[in-house]
Amino acid sequence: TDIPQTMQDLDLQEVAGRWHSVAMVASDISLLDSESAPLRVYVEELRPTPEGNLEIILREGANHVCVERNIVAQKTEDPAVFTVNYQGERKISVLDTDYAHYMFFCVGPCLPSAEHGMVCQYLARTQKVDEEVMEKFSRALQPLPGHVQIIQDPSGGQERCGF
């Protein structure tokens, strides 16, 4: 699955801090359709490391419990692309950000793989959905093949994981 165009010249220090998962999109809805779906995660914070990697603090559902997890995304030659070992080795690509309000990123299928599942998220600094940014998110994902569904955060900003 081809990931839409990534951002040029990502400044890691500028993406540091608290974020909220506002909307999620999947090329295969089974990746998101239940609380324990493999890529249904809620990003809470991004922390750049001194080595240029990106520590991601997230919440996910596991056995009807909301679990906090820290994963480290390893830098690549492209400043907007990282690799992460999360249920297999995957590629994370930052599509766009204005640093102050929103960030769009996609998590690709396990590498190497013929799997086509991809999940993209719209992160915001606040829990309020900006309709203009939502439109921009939708446009950024147009190159994705297959049936794409946008799921706005069902928790409405309440306890992430929705139990």
Curated annotation (Swiss-Prot):
A GO CC term attached to the entry: extracellular region
Keyword terms: Disulfide bond, Milk protein, Retinol-binding, Secreted, Transport
Chief place where the protein resides: secreted
Annotated family: Belongs to the calycin superfamily. Lipocalin family.
Function: Lactoglobulin is the primary component of whey, it binds retinol and is probably involved in the transport of that molecule.
SUBUNIT field: Monomer.
Protein name listed in UniProt: Beta-lactoglobulin-2
Taxonomic lineage from the root: Eukaryota, Metazoa, Chordata, Craniata, Vertebrata
